[in-house]
C-alpha cells in the first residue's frame, strides 16, 4: 500500500474486524511506549476490544527523564482514554544487560527481558494476547541483519506462545512510518504525538555505547534533555545524544587516517590528529549493516 493509496478509514475497519476475530472474547495487553507506533496500535485495539484491552508501559530504566510518568498521564487523557498500567523494571533490565558491550547482544538481552516481563503481566491479568506497534521497517531491518528490533519475534522464528505464554497481534506490521502517522491523525492523535520523532524500543541502552552503567545512563538522560530542547524547534528528521567511553584504541586501526582527515578538512597533515575510540557502534552502509569504531 503506497501513501497515496492508503485509506486510513478502510484500514481501520479491516484491522478492527481482524482483531475482534483473533482475540474473540479474550483479553489483550497493549505494549505502549508513548511513541507513535505503539500508541496508534493501542488506539486501533481499543476500538476493537474496548475494556478488554489493558495498555501496559514497562519502565526499562532506559527512557528519557520523567518519561514513564509523562506517558502514563498523556495516554490516560480522556481524549485518548488509554488507562496505562506502569510496570517498574529498571533494575531488572540493567542487571540483564550489565557487562555487555556488543550492540546486537544488548538488543537481544533487552528483547528477552522485555517479553519475560510482558509475559508475567499477561498471566497476572489473564491476557492471552499482546498487541504491539510493529511496522514494516522493524522486521525488514531485523531479517536483513541490519539490527535486531526488540519487537520482532515470529518473523525470526520465535514462538511467543510457547516461550512467553501469549500470542502477538500486530495491526500495523505492513505499514510504514508515514502511513502510521496518517492513521494516527485519522484517530485524532494530537500532532505532537503523531509526528513525534522515533525513539528506539531499547531506548537509551543503544545510545549508551559499549557497556552500560548507571553513571553513563544518568549522563545520557541529562544530555538527551539538552539536545532535544535545543534542536527540537528545527524539526530535523532525527537528532539525539550518545555517550561513549573516553578510551581510544592503542594501536592504529586504519592506515593513513590522519592524512585522509587532513585532506577532507583542507589542513596540513602536521596539524591533524585523529583518535579512534575503542568501543564500536552500529551504522548502515548502503543497505547493509556496519559495525565499527568511531574516529
Label the predicted regions.
Residues 1-295:
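ATP/NTP-dependent adenylation/nucleotidyl-transfer catalytic domains that generate, transfer
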Amino acid at each position: 500500500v503506497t501513501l497515496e493509496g492508503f485509506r486510513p478509514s478502510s484500514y481501520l475497519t479491516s484491522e478492527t474486524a481482524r482483531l475482534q476475530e483473533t482475540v474473540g472474547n479474550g483479553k489483550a495487553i497493549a505494549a505502549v511506549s508513548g511513541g507513535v507506533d505503539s500508541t496508534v496500535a493501542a488506539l486501533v485495539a481499543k476500538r476493537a476490544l474496548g475494556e478488554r484491552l489493558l495498555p501496559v508501559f514497562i519502565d526499562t530504566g532506559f527512557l528519557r527523564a520523567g518519561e514513564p510518568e509523562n506517558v502514563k498521564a498523556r495516554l490516560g487523557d480522556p481524549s485518548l482514554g488509554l488507562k496505562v498500567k506502569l510496570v517498574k523494571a529498571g533494575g531488572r533490565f540493567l542487571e540483564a544487560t550489565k557487562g555487555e558491550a556488543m550492540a546486537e547482544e544488548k538488543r537481544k538481552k533487552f528483547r528477552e527481558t522485555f517479553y519475560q516481563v510482558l509475559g508475567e503481566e499477561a498471566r497476572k491479568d489473564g491476557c492471552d494476547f499482546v498487541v504491539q506497534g510493529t511496522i514494516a521497517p522493524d522486521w525488514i531491518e531485523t531479517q536483513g541483519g541490519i539490527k535486531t528490533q526488540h519487537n520482532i519475534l515470529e518473523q525470526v522464528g520465535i514462538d511467543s506462545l510457547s516461550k512467553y505464554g501469549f500470542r502477538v497481534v500486530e495491526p500495523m506490521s505492513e505499514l510504514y512510518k508515514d502511513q502510521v502517522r496518517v492513521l494516527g491523525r485519522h484517530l485524532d492523535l494530537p500532532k505532537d504525538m503523531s509526528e513525534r520523532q522515533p525513539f528506539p524500543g531499547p531506548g537509551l541502552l543503544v545510545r549508551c555505547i559499549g557497556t552500560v552503567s548507571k553513571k553513563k545512563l544518568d549522563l545520557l538522560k541529562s544530555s538527551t534533555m539538552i539536545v532535544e530542547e535545543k534542536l527540537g524547534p528545527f524539526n530535523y528528521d532525527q537528532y539525539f545524544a550518545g555517550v561513549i567511553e573516553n578510551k581510544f584504541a592503542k594501536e592504529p586501526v586504519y592506515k593513513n587516517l590522519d592524512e585522509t582527515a587532513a585532506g577532507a578538512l583542507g589542513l596540513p597533515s602536521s596539524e591533524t590528529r585523529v583518535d579512534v575510540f575503542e568501543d564500536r557502534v552500529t551504522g548502515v552502509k548502503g543497505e547493509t549493516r556496519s559495525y565499527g569504531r568511531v574516529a
